[in-house]
From Swiss-Prot:
Gene that specifies this protein: SLX4
Name the UniProt record assigns to this protein: Structure-specific endonuclease subunit SLX4
Record localization: Nucleus
Pfam families per record: Slx4
Family to which this protein belongs: Belongs to the SLX4 family.
Length: 846
C-alpha cells in the first residue's frame, strides 16, 4: 500500500463538532484525497436498544490506558490506513463490512475502519472481533498474496460516526444485515462471550451421518467418574442398536398371538399344508378391532371345543387294532402257540382274548389309583354297537385262507387246497376220496411222507434232530385225539418188545389182518387223573398217562376245583394246553374249564365207537440210532430174520395187480378181516420202545408205469407216525402215504399159506443214485461260442429245472454213467428236487 504522508493522514482526524450535531465522514476515493461531511439531523427517535448497543460496544472495546471520556480530546497515534499499532496490517474482508441503517432514513452511508484511523482505541477491538469470527467460521487463513491483492482492490470503506451530547460514537454499517436489532443483539452476545465467559469453541457438525434420536431417558451417573460415563454411553449406543434390530428378530410372543387369533376357513383340520395356501385372515389380537376380536374369540373357542371333542372321541375309541396279518403271524411267535388247524372253533374267541392282553403293556399306576368316576350306563352298549367288525368273523376268514409256504415248485400243485392243512379232520371219507395225495396236517404226522409229496407244514419240516429225523412238536389235538392201544400188564410181549429193538418179525396172517378187539384190550386214557406238566407236553402231544394210572376204572366226571390252585399252577396248566400266559386269574380258570370240557368229550367219544380193528399190513424195521440221516448204503439196511417166530406166516412180494389196483387190494384186506375167525395170541410189534409210535400203513399209488414198480422196491425206512381215527363208522383206517425218500428199510409183505419166503434184494437209494448221476455228467462242449451248462451247474446257478427234461436225461444217459438199470418217474424226480431245495417245474402241466 502506498504511503500518502502526514498530510494525507490529517484528513482522517475527526473534526470537532458540537455535541448536538452528528457528522458522517465518507471516504470516496481510494486515494483518500477527498472527504465529504454531511450533517445528519439528530433524530430523537433512535431506537433505545441501538443506542444502548453502541454504548456497550464502545465500553467493551475501550482500552484501560485510553478511556473514553466525554468532551475530552485525547492524543492519537497516527498509523497507516487499516493498520494498528504493533500488529500486522490485515485487510478487512468484504463480508465483515457493517452497515448501520436507520429504519426511517436509508440514505446513510457506512465507513469501515475509519474509527481506527481517527482513534487508536477503536481499531484494535474491531480487528479482534473480526479475526475472532473469521477463526470460528473459517479456520484457514488466506495466503499473503491474496491479502495484498485484496488490500489494493477492496480499499473502499464506509462508516458512520454518531456523536451524542458529550460522547462521540462511530458505528460501522454492515450491508448484509437487514435487521439491525438482531445484529446488535448477536454482537453484544459475542462480546460478552469474548469478554468474561471464555467458552469453548463448538465442534463442527458432521453432515454425512445423523445419529439416531435417543428416545430412552438418560441415566444419571451419581459417581460422575469418566469411566462410568463412557460405559453408560457405550451401553446406550448398544441399546439403541438392539432396539433398532429387535424389529427384525423372531418373537415367540407374536407367533403365539398369531396362532391364537388364527382362524381357518375350513372347519376340518388340515394336514401337510403349505404356508402359501394358509388363509389370509390370520391376524393377531392386537390388530383386530373390537368387533373382529369378539368374533375371533368366539370362533377360537368353538374351534377349541371341536378339537377337544375330537380328542375325547379318540380316547373313547382307543383300542388295540387287530388285523388279519397280526392274528396270522401271532401263532408262530411262541413255541407254545398252537396251530390254528388244531384249535377247536369254540376256543378261538377265548384264544384271541388271551392273546390281546399279553400284547398290551402292563399299567400298574392305573390299577393302583381308585376309580372315582362311575360308569355311565349305556356307554358300553353303544361302544359294542359301534365296533367296526367283530373278531369272530375275522378269525373265521383266517381259518378259511390257504397259508402256503415254500418255493415256487412246492406251491405248484394241482390238488385241492384242503390238502395243505386247511382241513383238520382228515379222517373223513370225502376228503380222502377227493384228494389225490393224503397229507397229514399235524406236525406229529408230518414224519410219514410219501415218495411223491411231503408235508406242507413248514414248522413241522424245520424241526429235525441231529440225525436228520423229524421231531415231534408238542401239539395237543383237543378235538379228536386218537386213543392208544395199550397191552395188558401181564402180557409177556411187553418184556419181549424191549429186547427186540434191532429187528421186527412178521406176525401171522390172522393177526395182521386182525379182528375186532375186545373193549378190555383197548384202554382209554385217564383224562382227569393227575396234572399235565409242561415236560410231558414237550415229549409228545399224544402221549398219555402211565398204564398203571389208566387201568379199568370209572371215569371221574367231577371237574377239578381250579379256584384252590395257585396262580403259578394255573399258569402251568394253561401252558400245558398250548396257550399263552394270561394276567387275569378268572380268565385262566374259565379257559381251563372249557379245555377240560372239550377234552372230556373227546375222551368219552371213543367208548361209543369201535376200537382200532385192523393192524398194519406192513411191519417196519427201524433204523439204528447211529444210522446216516440222508443216504444209506445197501449194506446198512437191516434184513429180516430168516426164521419167523411161532404163529407167523411167510410173506410175499406185492404183485403188479395189487399195485395197479389198490382198491382191489383194500377190498381183499377187508375180506380177510371178515374171514378170519381165530384171534391172535401175539399182538403186532408196532409199539416199539416209544409208546406213541404206531406202524404206518403203506398205500401204493395207482400207476401203470414200470419205473414206478422198480422204484417201489427200493429199501426205505418208514418211521411210524401216529394216525388219526376216522369219525366215520368204518372198521378200518384209510391208508396214508408216508414214505421218507432219504431213509432205507426193506418192505415185507405177507402171502398165503404154502408160499416160500423170498429175500428182498437191497438196492441203493434212488435219490442217491440221482445225485451221483447229476454230478457224474461230463462237461458239454460249447455251441457257437455259447457254453452249455450241465445239470449240476444249472442247479448251482439256481436255474429252474424242467422235470420232464431231467427225467428223460436220467433215464437215457444219466443212470448209464453210474451203471444204474432202474428208471425214475417225473414225480420222483420232483421229490428229489424238493428234498434238495431245487426250483423245479413241469414243462407241460397235466
Amino acid at each position: 500500500m502506498t504511503d500518502h504522508g502526514p498530510d494525507a493522514l490529517d484528513a482522517f482526524s475527526p473534526p470537532r463538532v458540537g455535541s448536538a450535531s452528528p457528522v458522517v465522514i465518507s471516504l470516496v476515493s481510494p486515494a483518500l484525497t477527498q472527504m465529504t461531511v454531511t450533517p445528519i439531523d439528530n433524530s430523537p427517535k433512535l431506537p433505545f436498544n441501538l443506542a444502548q448497543g453502541l454504548e456497550s460496544d464502545l465500553e467493551s472495546h475501550s482500552d484501560a490506558s485510553n478511556p473514553l471520556h466525554p468532551n475530552v480530546s485525547h492524543p492519537m497515534t497516527r498509523v497507516a490506513l487499516g493498520e494498528k499499532a504493533g500488529a500486522e496490517n490485515l485487510p478487512v474482508h468484504r463480508t465483515k463490512r457493517r452497515k448501520l441503517g436507520n429504519q426511517r432514513d436509508n440514505t446513510a452511508e457506512s465507513m469501515e475502519d475509519l474509527v481506527d484511523c481517527s482513534r487508536n482505541h477503536f481499531q484494535p477491538a474491531e480487528d479482534e472481533s473480526t479475526t475472532q469470527k473469521q477463526k470460528t467460521r473459517k479456520p484457514a487463513k488466506p495466503s499473503e498474496k491474496g491479502q495484498k491483492s485484496e488490500k489494493t482492490a477492496n480499499l473502499r470503506l464506509r462508516g458512520k460516526v454518531k456523536k451524542a451530547s458529550d460522547t462521540q460514537v462511530l458505528v460501522p454499517i454492515d450491508k448484509s444485515a437487514q435487521d439491525p436489532s438482531q445484529k446488535f443483539a448477536s454482537q453484544h452476545r459475542a462480546d460478552e462471550e469474548n469478554g468474561g465467559l471464555h467458552l469453548e469453541e463448538a465442534t463442527s457438525r458432521r453432515d454425512y451421518w445423523t445419529p439416531i434420536k435417543d428416545t430412552n431417558s438418560a441415566s444419571i451417573d451419581l459417581t460422575g467418574s469418566p469411566v462410568s460415563i463412557q460405559a453408560d454411553k457405550a451401553q446406550a449406543k448398544s441399546k439403541d442398536f438392539r432396539e433398532l434390530m429387535s424389529e427384525f428378530n423372531f418373537s415367540r410372543e407374536t407367533s403365539h398371538e398369531v396362532e391364537a387369533g388364527c382362524q381357518l376357513v375350513n372347519d376340518k383340520p388340515t394336514t401337510k399344508q403349505l404356508l402359501e395356501f394358509m388363509p389370509q385372515n390370520c391376524r393377531t389380537s392386537k390388530s383386530l378391532d373390537s368387533e373382529s376380536l369378539d368374533t375371533g374369540t368366539s370362533s377360537t373357542s368353538e374351534g377349541n371345543g371341536k378339537r377337544k371333542q375330537t380328542k375325547k372321541a379318540k380316547r373313547s375309541a382307543k383300542s388295540k387294532i387287530t388285523t388279519i396279518t397280526s392274528l396270522t403271524t401271532g401263532r408262530y411267535e411262541s413255541s407254545l402257540a398252537p396251530e390254528g388247524d388244531h384249535i377247536p372253533s369254540s376256543l378261538v374267541d377265548n384264544m384271541v382274548e388271551s392273546i390281546q392282553p399279553a400284547e398290551k403293556a402292563p399299567s400298574n399306576r392305573k390299577n393302583t389309583k381308585p376309580k372315582s368316576k362311575k360308569a355311565i350306563p349305556g356307554r358300553a352298549e353303544c361302544y359294542a354297537l359301534l365296533k367296526p367288525a367283530p373278531t369272530m368273523e375275522a378269525l373265521k376268514t383266517i381259518e378259511n385262507q390257504a397259508l402256503l409256504f415254500g418255493t415256487s415248485s412246492q406251491l405248484e400243485r394241482e390238488s385241492s387246497p384242503n390238502v395243505y392243512g386247511l382241513e383238520p379232520e382228515l379222517g373223513r371219507d370225502e376228503v380222502k376220496s377227493n384228494s389225490i395225495q393224503n397229507i397229514s396236517s399235524e406236525p406229529s404226522t408230518g414224519m410219514g411222507v410219501s415218495r411223491f409229496s411231503k408235508s406242507k407244514n413248514l414248522w413241522g419240516a424245520s424241526s429235525r434232530d441231529l440225525d436228520g429225523y423229524l421231531l415231534n412238536v408238542d401239539m395237543i389235538d383237543l378235538v379228536d385225539p386218537t386213543p392208544k392201544i395199550t397191552p395188558k400188564p401181564g402180557d409177556e410181549r411187553q418184556s419181549n418188545l424191549s429186547n427186540k429193538n434191532t429187528e421186527r418179525n412178521i406176525p401171522e396172517e390172522s393177526s395182521l389182518l386182525g379182528e375186532q378187539v375186545n373193549a378190555k384190550d383197548v384202554e382209554l386214557p385217564d383224562c382227569l387223573a393227575g396234572e399235565i406238566s409242561t415236560s410231558d407236553t414237550m415229549q409228545n402231544s399224544f402221549e398219555y398217562l402211565n398204564t398203571t394210572n389208566s387201568q379199568d376204572g370209572p371215569v371221574d366226571d367231577s371237574m377239578p376245583n381250579y379256584d384252590q390252585l395257585s396262580t403259578p399252577e394255573l399258569a402251568k396248566k394253561l401252558a400245558s394246553f398250548g396257550f399263552r400266559p394270561i394276567k387275569k386269574r378268572e380268565r385262566i380258570i374259565e379257559l381251563l374249564e372249557k379245555c377240560w370240557e372239550s377234552k372230556r368229550k373227546s375222551c368219552i367219544e371213543p367208548t361209543t365207537k369201535p376200537a382200532i380193528l385192523s393192524t398194519p399190513q406192513v411191519v417196519i424195521q427201524p433204523i439204528p440210532p447211529n444210522a446216516n440221516s440222508k443216504f444209506m448204503d445197501s449194506d446198512s439196511a437191516i434184513k429180516p430174520s430168516s426164521v419167523p417166530p411161532k404163529g407167523t406166516r411167510k410173506p410175499k412180494k406185492i404183485t403188479s395187480k395189487e399195485i395197479t389196483n389198490p382198491a382191489r387190494s383194500s377190498w381183499s384186506t377187508a375180506k380177510n378181516l371178515k374171514s378170519s375167525s381165530k384171534p391172535t395170541d401175539n399182538m403186532p410189534d408196532s409199539m416199539g420202545s416209544q409208546s406213541y409210535v404206531q406202524p404206518e400203513i403203506i398205500e401204493i399209488e395207482d400207476s401203470t408205469d414200470e419205473n414206478l414198480l422198480e422204484s417201489s422196491k427200493q429199501p426205505r425206512d418208514y418211521r411210524g407216525a401216529h394216525t388219526l381215527a376216522s369219525r366215520s363208522a368204518s372198521s378200518h383206517i384209510t391208508p396214508q402215504i408216508s414214505s421218507a425218500p432219504s431213509q432205507t428199510v426193506p418192505i415185507q409183505t405177507r402171502a398165503s399159506a404154502g408160499t416160500n419166503e423170498k429175500e428182498i434184494v437191497d438196492l441203493p437209494d434212488i435219490f442217491l443214485q440221482i445225485t451221483n448221476a447229476v454230478k457224474a455228467q461230463p462237461r458239454i462242449r460249447s455251441v457257437n461260442g455259447v457254453k452249455q451248462p450241465t445239470w449240476h451247474e444249472k442247479i448251482v446257478m439256481y436255474d429252474p429245472i424242467w422235470l420232464d427234461d431231467l427225467t428223460l436225461w436220467l433215464n437215457v444217459e444219466g443212470f448209464k454213467l453210474i451203471k444204474e438199470d432202474r428208471e425214475v418217474h417225473p414225480y420222483l424226480v420232483r421229490e428229489w428236487c424238493e428234498s434238495k431245495g431245487i426250483c423245479c417245474c413241469f414243462r407241460n402241466k397235466k
